[in-house]
Design a protein with these regions (language model features):
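Alpha-helical cap/lid subdomain in secreted, periplasmic
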Residues: 1-104, 170, 177-203, 207-254, ...
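Glycan-recognition and processing domains
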Residues: 96-199, 203-210
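Extended, polar beta-sheet/loop recognition surfaces of beta-rich domains
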Residues: 264-277
Length: 277
């Protein structure tokens, strides 16, 4: 994702913000090498707040865990304010620092050229999905052959988020394919979705849900069973991306998503696909 953003033509600024879980852990040790390779500013909320959680008020504690966290993984409003303060502190430090890095001075290159050189180096984690594209009802790939079978409805009960500076909620993946066996009994006779295309990697994005009227779907590639997509494993409404295959070369494949026989009277939503040619 970082490489994808850094390669965008409008050259957006990138900051890596490492939040923290209630067990005083995050992924900064695993992911910070990405920031170091591309010389990106990084903010660690863990480093900012976790050391003071164990202190008493008269020892310098600023905020308690109960005040900072809304649940195990998400900050409260007060916690988000602390995170905003951390980012603001980063901007203050940047304003105080010189604009040219030592590397840029020693190499005689602009920071933009150094970044481009680093992007040409081997990635520290991977870049298998750097050029991934979305496939849904709106963003259709001309060489993808789709038989939607019984997936002829559109799900409107979707995970929604605030986008950019908008406070109103925007549904994610609105151009989806939904199988609805609760209303249309004819769908139960064609409880499948088929996609044929040539690509190197393919991801399925489906909707997780805790509703009782949601069922499972089995995923087949070229007639071979691969896995079952079960919305109840996570059991709350959100988007779940899973890898169907990730190969070294691009080949033609037929992917069939078939509603489990015992769940033909329920619903299942394909939010979209991600593909790499």
């Amino acid at each position: 994702l970082v490489r994808k953003v850094l390669n965008l033509p409008w050259k957006p600024a990138v900051i890596l913000l490492f939040s923290v879980f209630a067990n005083d852990w995050n992924l900064q040790d695993r992911l910070s090498p990405v920031g170091k390779l591309y010389d990106l500013p990084m903010v660690s909320v863990l480093d900012a707040v976790s050391p003071q959680f164990a202190l008493k008020n008269d020892e310098g504690r600023v905020i308690s865990k109960n005040q900072f966290f809304y649940d195990m993984f998400h900050p409260s409003n007060a916690g988000h304010s602390v995170m905003a303060d951390c980012i603001e502190y980063l901007f203050e430090r940047i304003d105080q620092a010189g604009h040219a890095s030592l590397d840029a001075f020693e190499k005689g290159l602009t920071e933009e050229k150094i970044l481009q050189e680093n992007l040409n180096l081997a990635p520290v984690i991977g870049n298998s999905f750097e050029n991934i594209r979305l496939l849904d009802k709106k963003d259709i790939y001309a060489k993808a052959y789709i038989d939607e079978g019984g997936f002829d409805s559109t799900d409107t009960q979707l995970q929604s988020v605030e986008m950019d500076d908008q406070l109103s909620l925007t549904p994610e993946f609105p151009y989806n394919w939904m199988y609805d066996g609760t209303k249309n009994t004819l769908n139960r006779e064609k409880a499948y979705f088929e996609l044929e295309m040539e690509c190197r990697a393919l991801l399925l994005v489906f909707k997780d849900s805790g509703e009782v009227n949601v069922g499972k779907a089995k995923v087949y590639v070229d007639g071979e069973y691969h896995f079952t997509a079960d919305p109840h494993i996570n059991n709350w409404q959100h988007c779940n991306a899973v890898i169907i295959f990730n190969n070294k070369t691009s080949e033609n494949h037929v992917v069939r998503i078939e509603i489990a026989e015992e769940d033909r009277d329920k619903q299942f939503t394909i939010l979209g696909f991600g593909y790499v040619l």
